[in-house]
Swiss-Prot record:
Catalytic reactions of this protein: all-trans-octaprenyl diphosphate + 4-hydroxybenzoate = 4-hydroxy-3-(all-trans-octaprenyl)benzoate + diphosphate
Organism from which the protein derives: Coxiella burnetii (strain RSA 493 / Nine Mile phase I)
The protein's name in its UniProt record: 4-hydroxybenzoate octaprenyltransferase
Annotated Gene Ontology cellular component terms: plasma membrane
Pathway: Cofactor biosynthesis; ubiquinone biosynthesis
Similarity-based family: Belongs to the UbiA prenyltransferase family.
Length: 287
């Protein structure tokens, strides 16, 4: 018999509710899309569904990730005390929790139109496959970018009934962004990952990691600039991009010596990048 009161702290850790930055990194692209699709005036229903869905799916994704990595996590110093790796949560408990979260997410998406439901099925498959890719390719961060950005076509489908070209332009920018911050994150564990056979862009880029991150950061901002021009956004949007540029330069400063605590700080700093881009979008539609 599961003692919920005793296990709840472990469940919350398994779902990473003790590390909310991951929720926001998933939420910002969702909010970008919800606001742009609705031209700055999203319906309360759609906004709530997508915000709640982001929180739930991030939690579910963390469970799948830890399930896939439970044997590898024991050999990486930073992850060896994760609930599944340490045994504080059983595989059965994790799967039951995942099933509950999936049911909640499915219930939410059923409140939307058919196209959004169909896209949601693809989104679930993207999330399920991602954790296993790091064994076979050095580009799991690219797949993560697609999975984390899949809420964008869903938001447009829910709002306007189809996925226009501008949605895919936003999607492209959003896909590149997680490659940036998850490469910074992977730099923390690079030595341990090499030992246990985990692949990542941090390992692929090697000593060119900062250069590649910089090129990706520039591509993100350039794509957003093109998006702003296409949508005729005003100066508020570009001020948001300017702040994002400053934050990205700060991240380059942080990772210059590739020290794990500084790489983690750079990763966390991306929350503010997403926030200021969203703030620029929000203020553009209000002025």
């Amino acid at each position: 018999m599961i003692n919920l009161r005793q296990q709840m702290p472990h469940y919350l850790r398994l779902m990473r509710f003790d590390k909310p930055v991951g929720i926001f990194l998933l939420l910002w692209p969702t909010l970008w899309a919800v606001w742009i699709a609705a031209k700055g005036a999203p319906s309360f229903k759609i906004a709530v569904i997508f915000i709640a869905g982001s929180v739930v799916m991030r939690a579910a994704g963390c469970i799948v990730n830890d399930f896939a990595d439970r044997h590898l996590d024991k050999h990486v110093q930073r992850t060896q005390m994760r609930p599944l790796a340490s045994g504080s949560v059983s595989v059965t408990e994790a799967m039951l929790l995942f099933a509950v979260l999936s049911l909640i997410a499915f219930t939410l998406v059923l409140l939307l139109n058919r196209l959004t439901v169909e896209l949601a099925v693809i989104g679930i498959l993207l999330a399920l496959v991602y954790p296993f890719l790091k064994r076979f390719t050095h580009l799991p961060q690219l797949w993560l970018g697609v999975a984390f950005s899949w809420s964008i076509p869903m938001a447009f489908a829910a709002t306007v009934g189809h996925v226009p070209a501008v949605a895919w332009l936003l999607f492209f920018a959003a896909v590149l962004w997680p490659i940036v911050y998850d490469t910074q994150y992977a730099m923390i564990d690079r030595e341990d990952d090499v030992k246990v056979g985990i692949k990542s862009t941090a390992i692929l880029f090697g000593r060119y990691d900062r250069l590649m991150i910089g090129l990706l950061q520039g591509s993100v901002l350039l794509t957003f600039g093109l998006l702003g021009w296409y949508l005729r956004f005003n100066y508020w949007f570009y001020l948001g991009l300017l702040v994002a540029l400053g934050l990205m330069c700060y991240q380059q400063f942080l990772i210059r010596h590739r020290k794990p605590p500084d790489c983690f700080a750079a990763f966390r700093n991306n929350n503010w990048v997403g926030f200021f881009i969203f703030l620029g979008i929000l203020l553009t539609y209000r002025n």
